[in-house]
């Protein structure tokens, strides 16, 4: 038994037994996590079983597994595939005739990180859609362009919905007091032709005023862009970060008109950074909005224009594989906020 446990899990027999107790020893858990990070499949299977627990430890382990799966935490190169396959096996067990009504498996019958990882692994479309229904429920598009159909949940070319982007960016703001992020909006109302950015700015100023770094996520019809109002040398500036083709002049003018409400008097105080970063990140405009908010929240007093321009220029030097990995990992990290 000693030899078997040690060879499979790199744990002593007492350490292994402690994993099934009420209080798992910190030493045993640390050793197990280390093996998981190195890609030990047996330890991954064991940690996924621990993640089924409905206590603090179970939630902690489930979060750790998702961090490895989404690239937020580093592990072996194929760690995400090993984890989601382990979750898929658990999902199959959870749905057999013996265990399907067992409450110990409830994380695989309701929205959870474990269920999301299992769904990403299955190749059976009907099962994939069934899992997506459990995760997403009934969602409705707020614009004609939003793709909220459940069959698209794991698609690497899916446009982020307003709710997904809001959940993720609000989650980021809670971690950083330097930014204020508003709920995502369309730029122009489809029927009244009202400039919604202007309306949101007026409401924000009336209610609480603009913060030193105020972010608006704006959809121009089928594309998300980031609009930042910030103070530089006591002067209000506006930065538009657009990761696809250059905006047309009408759209730019609508943004400039809205910016005047924030106190910007000259059009040259609205800075447009426009670079196509999406060749290998299809429909990834929302991903870049999320990522740039991360960058801005960590930029301190640095000039936002410099921060975002340097990021865009560096991103274009990445290989196709690195850009594709950014697409996969960022989508996973964003959707995690909708699972909480």
Swiss-Prot record:
- A Pfam family of the record is ElaD-SseL-like_C
Cystine pairs annotated here are none
Q: What is the similarity comment for this entry?
A: Belongs to the peptidase C79 family.
The upper taxonomy is: Bacteria, Pseudomonadati, Pseudomonadota, Gammaproteobacteria, Enterobacterales
Question: Could you tell me the EC number(s) of this protein?
Answer: 3.4.22.-
Any one GO cellular component localisation term in the record: extracellular region
Q: What does this protein do?
A: Effector proteins function to alter host cell physiology and promote bacterial survival in host tissues. This protease targets the host cell ubiquitin pathway by acting as a deubiquitinase in infected host cells.
- Identification of the protein by name: Deubiquitinase SseL
């Amino acid at each position: 038994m000693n030899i078997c446990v040690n060879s499979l899990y790199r744990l002593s027999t007492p350490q292994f037994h402690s994993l099934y107790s009420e209080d798992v020893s910190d030493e045993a858990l640390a050793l197990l996590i280390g093996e998981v990070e190195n890609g030990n499949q047996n330890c991954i299977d064991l940690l996924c079983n621990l993640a089924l627990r409905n206590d603090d430890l179970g939630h902690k382990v489930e979060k750790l597994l998702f961090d490895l799966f989404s690239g937020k935490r580093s592990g072996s190169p194929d760690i995400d595939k090993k984890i989601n396959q382990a979750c898929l096996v658990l999902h199959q067990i959870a749905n057999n005739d013996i265990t399907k009504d067992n409450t110990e498996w409830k994380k695989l019958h309701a929205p959870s990180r474990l269920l999301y990882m299992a769904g990403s692994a299955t190749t059976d479309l009907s099962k994939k859609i069934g899992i997506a229904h459990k995760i997403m429920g009934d969602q409705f598009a707020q614009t004609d362009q939003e793709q909220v159909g459940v069959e698209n949940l794991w698609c690497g070319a899916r446009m982020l919905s307003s709710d997904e982007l809001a959940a993720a960016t609000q989650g980021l703001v809670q971690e950083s007091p330097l930014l204020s992020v508003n709920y995502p909006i369309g730029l122009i109302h489809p029927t009244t032709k009202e400039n919604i950015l202007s309306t949101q700015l007026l409401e924000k100023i009336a209610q609480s005023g603009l913060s030193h770094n105020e972010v608006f996520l704006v959809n121009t019809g089928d594309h998300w862009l980031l609009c930042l109002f910030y103070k530089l040398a006591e002067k209000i500036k506006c930065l538009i970060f657009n990761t696809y083709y250059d905006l047309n002049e009408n759209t730019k003018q609508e943004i400039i008109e809205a910016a005047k409400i924030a106190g910007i008097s000259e059009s040259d105080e609205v800075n447009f950074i426009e670079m196509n970063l999406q060749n290998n990140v299809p429909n990834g405009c929302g991903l870049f909005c999320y990522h740039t908010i991360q960058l801005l929240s960590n930029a301190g007093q640095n000039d936002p224009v410099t921060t975002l321009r340097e990021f865009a220029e560096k991103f274009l030097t990445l290989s196709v594989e690195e850009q594709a990995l950014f697409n996969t990992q960022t989508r996973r990290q964003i959707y995690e906020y909708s699972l909480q």
